[in-house]
């Protein structure tokens, strides 16, 4: 399956996800973030896909940073519920709440069969990454992440 969407890979660094690789969709007019760019883990699908599989102490640290920063959209209870959903279905979704036009889907990459420090994912307009399309796209990304995980084991 070819998605023709932007593809990214990121690694966790403290409370951020750092983009380490990516390619932009030939069909997207949206601005992409560049390799080396950082986003808070709770603000993107790549970050949530990694955070969901971190030890409780790491999640607690992210929640404490909510209180310190008092940032918009930083609800610890909602985050915990979302992380539980990510663990159960295997992938994260992030909708751009500010613009409402972009959707991201990401899955964790498992290192040596046990730790999650990275994720891969796609992003594109919500007109193409619709609720009906997301499960099939997520399955494709999950299969790709499993191949990467096997190569890293």
Regions found by a protein language model. Give the residues of each.
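Intrinsically disordered, low-complexity terminal regulatory regions
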Residues: 1-24, 136, 140-152
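Generic structural signal for secondary-structure transition and capping sites
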Residues: 4, 55, 88-92, 146, ...
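Histidine-centered metal-chelating micro-motifs
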Residues: 6-8, 38, 92-93, 104
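Residue-level signature for short turns and capping positions that connect secondary-structure elements
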Residues: 14, 24-25, 46, 127
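Acidic-glycine-rich active-site phosphate/pyrophosphate-binding loop
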Residues: 21-28, 116
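Short, solvent-exposed recognition segments
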Residues: 28-98
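Extended hydrophobic
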Residues: 72-145
């Amino acid at each position: 399956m070819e998605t023709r969407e932007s593809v990214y890979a990121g690694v966790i660094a403290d409370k951020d996800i750092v983009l380490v690789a990516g390619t932009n969709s030939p069909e997207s007019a949206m601005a992409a973030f560049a390799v080396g760019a950082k986003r808070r883990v709770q603000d993107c699908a790549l970050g949530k896909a990694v955070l969901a599989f971190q030890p409780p102490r790491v999640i607690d640290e992210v929640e404490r940073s909510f209180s310190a920063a008092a940032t918009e959209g930083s609800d610890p209870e909602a985050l915990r519920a979302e992380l539980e959903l990510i663990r159960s279905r295997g992938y994260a979704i992030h909708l751009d709440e500010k613009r409402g036009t972009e959707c991201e889907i990401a899955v964790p990459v498992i290192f040596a069969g046990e730790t999650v420090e990275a994720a891969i994912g796609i992003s594109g307009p919500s007109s193409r990454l619709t609720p009906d399309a997301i499960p099939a796209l997520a399955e494709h990304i999950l299969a790709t992440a499993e191949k990467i995980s096997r190569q890293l084991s």
